[in-house]
Amino acid sequence: MEALSTAIGSNLCWVQPKTLERQFELRTEGGLFGSLRFEKALGTLATASSAAGRWTFKRAGFMNPRVTIREAGRDVDLAVYWPKFWGGGWLECADGSRFQWKSMNFWGTSWGFANTREELVFTMKPGAEKSKLSDLLKSQAIVEIGTQSFGLAELPLLLMLGWYLMIMQQDDAATTAAVIS
């Protein structure tokens, strides 16, 4: 995998190579910058990889929901994401840094992380630069990273976690639709 710093000026997209597999790649036309793979078809445990490291994400708690973020192979939380009831939430890192996950539009189709000064780190919106008919049932997103964010040490982790949160949101919406119908 390539370092994100080499992607400055490129169009980054999250793509799903195979429709029925819960595996995703962060790509430009010519390079691979990250991956996210769910361990089970219906579970919430996922492993994310980039040139900066490997992490696991796991949703936990019912009355007090959260997503734990750990370095792969470790049992200590590196960070915890605390969702808010109506969407969005806060990521609290072990070093004290915090980032807000929030909707970028009224419909909640575009999401991104911002720092505590409310400066956007990046945004993700569903779709692909070049959509094909075979992509119709795949989860994909266009990623727009602020140029000031490429030097941010947490950027690779935030990109992986952001996509994990979008996939979890899609799964929750599909489950709700199935229950209601």
Can you describe what each PLM-predicted range is?
Residues 1-181:
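Intrinsically disordered, low-complexity proline/glycine-rich segments
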